[in-house]
């Protein structure tokens, strides 16, 4: 249960980080 929760948490963090990174790249490409 704890391991599954940690995995879900990591996935959320990675997903949020990826979205933020994509947004930052788009802003640089199209300022």
Curated annotation (Swiss-Prot):
Enzyme superclass (EC): oxidoreductase
Keyword terms: 4Fe-4S, Electron transport, FAD, Flavoprotein, Iron, Iron-sulfur, Metal-binding, Oxidoreductase, Transport, Ubiquinone
Swiss-Prot/TrEMBL catalytic activity: a ubiquinone + reduced [electron-transfer flavoprotein] = a ubiquinol + oxidized [electron-transfer flavoprotein] + H(+)
E.C. no: 1.5.5.1
InterPro entries: FAD/NAD-bd_sf
Domain of life, per lineage: Bacteria
Binding site for FAD: 11-25
Cofactor note: Binds 1 [4Fe-4S] cluster.
Example of a GO MF term: electron-transferring-flavoprotein dehydrogenase activity
Cofactor(s) required for function per UniProt: [4Fe-4S] cluster; FAD
Purpose of the protein: Accepts electrons from ETF and reduces ubiquinone.
Subunit structure of this chain's protein: Monomer.
Protein known as: Electron transfer flavoprotein-ubiquinone oxidoreductase
Originating species: Paracoccus denitrificans
Taxon lineage: Bacteria, Pseudomonadati, Pseudomonadota, Alphaproteobacteria, Rhodobacterales
């Amino acid at each position: 249960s704890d391991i599954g929760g940690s995995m879900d948490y990591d996935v959320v963090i990675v997903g949020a980080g990826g979205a933020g990174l994509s947004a930052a790249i788009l802003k640089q490409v199209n300022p």
